[in-house]
């Protein structure tokens, strides 16, 4: 089975590579900052991405139909258990669960227009352009795989992520300032996870993938929150003892203040 998966992956890469013509465009991009600092007062922010599509040679012609841009931002990976509940005899009960393995904790997909106006449905699925087209590995009994797009667990997983601002899809999220210069704003909610974020920009024209470029940024804790996090990781035993002592002292102080004579 492993051999078959490897052969399928090679075939997919060959298909994608075959859809990219000889380099005629070069993508240059930059982001406004590579590090975002958060503390207890963090309410969210955004990162601005700028880029340009340049001919790779003086003889390359500008595309008559213009360029299309798709920006994908993926946060730290995590494993999530999605549970489905039903009301039985007046009580909400878990009736099923699904484990999503190593999926992005944050995922944003930004483009300059809807995907069906950029390329064919088959290419949209092949390149995994939209949220609905992304592969989310799941634990299915003893097997690991993805399921159909309208699977209720998968749909609910994406819906809940979008409600918290952790999954975003905006088909007007990329602005073409000129036919070759573009701008995109990456929204980061207050609950954005700490860690590294990968940014990928893909250029398409006439429905075909022409070029891609990658960048990255990170979200870090600063101030007292960072001190506490470091203490918990590096001095686990001491941190646990200190926390327990503080809880005991707080309880004792409250008992003294509010006791009745």
Go through each PLM region and give its residues.
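Short, aromatic-rich amphipathic segments at membrane interfaces
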Residues: 187, 210-239
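A short tyrosine-centered beta-strand micro-motif
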Residues: 195-201
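Bacterial N-terminal signal peptides
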Residues: 8-17
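Sec/Tat signal peptide C-region and signal peptidase I cleavage site
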Residues: 19-24
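Short solvent-exposed capping/turn motifs at the termini of beta-strands
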Residues: 53-57
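N-terminal edge beta-strand
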Residues: 25-41
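Juxtamembrane interface at the cytosolic side of transmembrane helices
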Residues: 247-261
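Membrane-proximal low-complexity regions enriched in glycine and acidic/polar residues
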Residues: 87-193
């Amino acid at each position: 089975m492993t051999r078959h998966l490897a052969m399928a992956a090679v075939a997919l890469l060959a298909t994608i590579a075959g859809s990219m013509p000889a380099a005629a465009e070069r993508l240059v991009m930059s982001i406004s900052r590579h590090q975002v600092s958060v503390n207890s007062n963090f309410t969210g922010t955004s990162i601005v991405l700028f880029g340009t599509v340049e001919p790779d040679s003086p003889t390359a012609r500008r595309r008559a139909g213009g360029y299309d841009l798709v920006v994908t931002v993926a946060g730290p990976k995590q494993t999530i258990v999605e549970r489905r509940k039903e009301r039985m005899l007046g009580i909400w009960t878990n009736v099923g669960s699904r484990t999503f393995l190593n999926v992005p904790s944050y995922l944003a997909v930004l483009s300059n227009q809807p995907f069906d106006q950029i390329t064919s449905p088959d290419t949209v699925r092949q390149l995994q352009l939209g949220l609905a087209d992304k592969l989310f590995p799941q634990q299915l009994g003893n097997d690991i795989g993805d399921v159909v797009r309208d699977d209720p667990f998968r749909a609910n997983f994406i819906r809940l992520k979008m409600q918290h601002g952790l999954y975003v899809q905006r088909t007007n999220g990329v602005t073409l300032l000129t036919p070759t210069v573009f701008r995109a704003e990456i929204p980061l909610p207050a609950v954005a996870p700490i860690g590294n974020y990968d940014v990928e920009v893909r250029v398409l024209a006439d429905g075909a993938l022409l070029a891609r470029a990658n960048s990255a940024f990170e979200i870090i804790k600063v101030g007292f929150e960072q001190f506490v996090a470091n203490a918990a990781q590096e001095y686990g035993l001491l941190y646990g003892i200190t926390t327990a002592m503080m809880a005991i002292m707080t309880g004792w102080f409250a008992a003294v203040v509010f006791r009745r004579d």
